[in-house]
Every structure is written in structure tokens, then in C-alpha cells.
Amino acid sequence: MSIQNEETIWNLVDAKKEAFIELADRVFDTPETLYKEFQSVKEHVSTLEAEGFRITQNVCGMPTAVIGEAGDEGPIIAILGEFDALPGLSQEPGVAEHKPIAEGGDGHGCGHNLLGSAALLAATAVKDWLAETG
């Protein structure tokens, strides 16, 4: 990849990163465990729609699974994101030691809120870069 292409991609990421940080924060604030991420998937679907992706929901019969697609030709680039919270990992944000919001509650102690939003930002940047460069 050329330096120019790399700079273009980073500029695309930088232009949208605040919106995706806000997405990660909203998901963090609503910790939902595996197969129960109903609000989190709504947040991701809303972002996919805003970014112009075609959306398939209820993938493999899972109401919290979603696919976003862009373009009509190959090659196909797949990026996996996840946004489930984990039981017992409730945690105040920005605190390095264990400090649960709710003792024994669910939380994003492993950063899955970040995995989902970062994967979606990466997919958006690639989509936008391909649209710009052909």
C-alpha cells in the first residue's frame, strides 16, 4: 500500500472516529450478554444504515446477528465485530482497578464494545476508500 493510500485511509478514519467512539460508549453503557444484545445491535444497525451499508438482520436465526454489505463486486472483505458484555464484569469506565458499576453485574470489562465499533469503523473506512479510489 502506498503512503498516499495509507494517509487517505487514516484521514477517513479520523473524520468519523468520534461517531464510532460514541457508538462504543453507548454500547458500554448498555451491557448486554451473549444473544441478548438487543439495544447494542440496534445501535450498530443504525450506524450501518447511516453509512450506507445493505443490512441483513437475524443472521442464522440469531436476532442479535447482523451483516452489513457494500459494493457489488469482489473481492469480498469480511470484518468481524462483536459487542456482547460478559457476566460479572461490570466496571466503571476509565478506572484501572476493579470498580464495578453494579456489583456482580454485566459489563464490557474485555472491551467488546470497542471491538464492535472499531470493526464497523474499519469496514466503513475500507468502503469509503474503495468508493474514492475505485
Regions found by a protein language model. Give the residues of each.
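Acidic/His- and Gly-rich active-site-bordering loop/insert found
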Residues: 3-108, 113, 117-134
